């Protein structure tokens, strides 16, 4: 089988499936990407380069679409070069961030499988969750933002969504094309472990399960992942719990949602709140094995999200049997049950978040039980080694 993967990043969501397919000598795995940093065995990585950037005078409704088009054109040119060199895929599997837009024009008779991550809606998702009514201007921008996704929904032979909540966001006219199939969690790696140390070298601090540690992990410290509310909660908890250590993994940036003008959410909260920074440790982005060790020593791992894409990190934490305190939002409740696999709080209720974290810290035995229950959920339905064969069989079923 010849399979062509498309993603701006490499290997991103396709890491496990691309590597698994590449193990078979009968398969040729080609991956078109914008990433130049990583290579994987038996995968032919073909890097594309962008010819231009978004023009400054671009209509603001079109900036996201323009960015997608710039990537789409670069991927298309790269695919044409591969075609001229004699490569023809049996199937194309791509992320719908622009890369897949023109594939049917280059390989019209090749099945196109699209990975759909998020379709923007005026209701039922992230928009309006904060109680602010979207203006007509906002809605017009939102409608335009889906343009490239609508092209892919029309063009693709089939689509994959990793969760039911994400699939529900897609238009009903295209639901017949969509299969809900999660990426899978490496449950052999993300396991609970007792004798673990998490070392913060620049502070000469070693943390273990014997310590009282509240953890928070995110790609970006942003509103969509509840970072401001988390910091508010920590400012209250610090005054009540002198031995509590807080470890925050992630970068001082916004990946999703609105950015602040002239500052960041981290800077804003550090300026606004009375915090004991000697007990708050910003450790940046962690390599995966160190991140898993952080989960293993956590006394209470806090995860919050708008009704939006659920972070992989939540399921990693569940697989590690981590004591979890999370927001009671639909991306979370698809996987977690309050008082069974963790403790859930209202996203905007800081006092409730404080209460739930404090309860977790005071009731370790109960939280250990919830953590074990959470791991069982992952073992039952989201194991990578169970889902990977399903993904491969689904891909093969689409080849004519």
Language-model regions: role of each:
Residues 250-254, 260-286:
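Nucleotide-activated donor-binding/catalytic signature segment of Leloir-type glycosyltransferases, i.e.
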Residues 338-339, 343-350, 359-364:
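Conserved acidic donor-binding segment of nucleotide-sugar-dependent glycosyltransferases
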Residues 1-46:
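N-terminal subdomain of nucleotide-sugar transferases
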Residues 165, 184:
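Carbohydrate-associated surface elements
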Residues 352, 359, 366-381, 387-393:
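A short, well-ordered alpha-helix in the C-terminal region of glycosyltransferases
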Residues 52-62, 110-148, 188, 192-197, ...:
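Acceptor-binding helix/loop patch of EC 2.4 sugar-transfer enzymes
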